């Protein structure tokens, strides 16, 4: 959503995604967990996003309206950031907070409050669109197979298993919207060293589902 809002084409987004060497800026650091409650520091990720976008705009500085959700730990509520509510906020700050899967990525701070991935509570970020007609809303859902973890012996295995369990117990809505479900099977979405071939396979899978 960020890249589309910044005016990038789908082809440009794909090329950028395939060229990214994620382990160069997504590094697991024990110290980050104790300081920011997540093993992966978001600062290098934020820097890379600014580099890709070519700028670091606020919500009010781009033409397209984009909503970015993050879950506020202080209030136990999902907050939707946009030019209507937070015009002076840097969009990439909101994106980093929305990426902050608990324990894996460092949590975000904004106006003294702590934020994590909005998807930890809601399966779909629908709240800003409740006034729309059902046929005007399309949600893309990534579905993973339930995985049995033979041995949980490392912090990484424990956190991944915990997060997968949390994602299977999120709030869902009965709103009759169009849902495109993309089943990625046993793919490990937390594999930061994913190969070029695996990225292509996932892209083709998503393209096939959306074209059906």
Language-model features, listed with the residues they occupy:
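Patatin-like phospholipase
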Residues: 2-212
């Amino acid at each position: 959503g960020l890249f589309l809002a910044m005016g990038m084409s789908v082809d440009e987004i794909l090329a950028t995604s395939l060229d990214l060497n994620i382990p160069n800026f997504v590094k697991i650091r024990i110290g980050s967990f104790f300081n920011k409650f997540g093993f992966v520091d978001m600062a290098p990720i934020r820097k890379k996003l600014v580099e890709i976008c070519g700028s670091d705009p606020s919500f009010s500085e781009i033409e397209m309206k984009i909503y970015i959700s993050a879950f506020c730990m202080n209030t136990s509520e999902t907050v939707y950031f946009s030019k209507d509510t937070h015009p002076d906020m840097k969009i990439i700050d909101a994106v980093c907070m929305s990426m902050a899967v608990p324990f894996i990525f460092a949590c975000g701070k904004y106006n003294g409050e702590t934020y994590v991935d909005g998807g930890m509570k809601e399966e779909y970020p629908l709240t800003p669109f409740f006034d729309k007609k059902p046929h005007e809303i399309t949600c893309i859902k990534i579905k993973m197979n339930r995985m049995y973890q033979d041995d949980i012996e490392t912090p990484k295995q424990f956190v991944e298993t915990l997060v997968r369990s949390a994602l299977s117990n999120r709030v869902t809505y009965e709103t009759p919207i169009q849902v495109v479900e993309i089943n990625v099977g046993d793919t490990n979405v937390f594999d930061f060293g994913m190969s070029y071939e695996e990225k292509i396979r996932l892209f083709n899978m998503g393209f096939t589902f959306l074209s059906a």
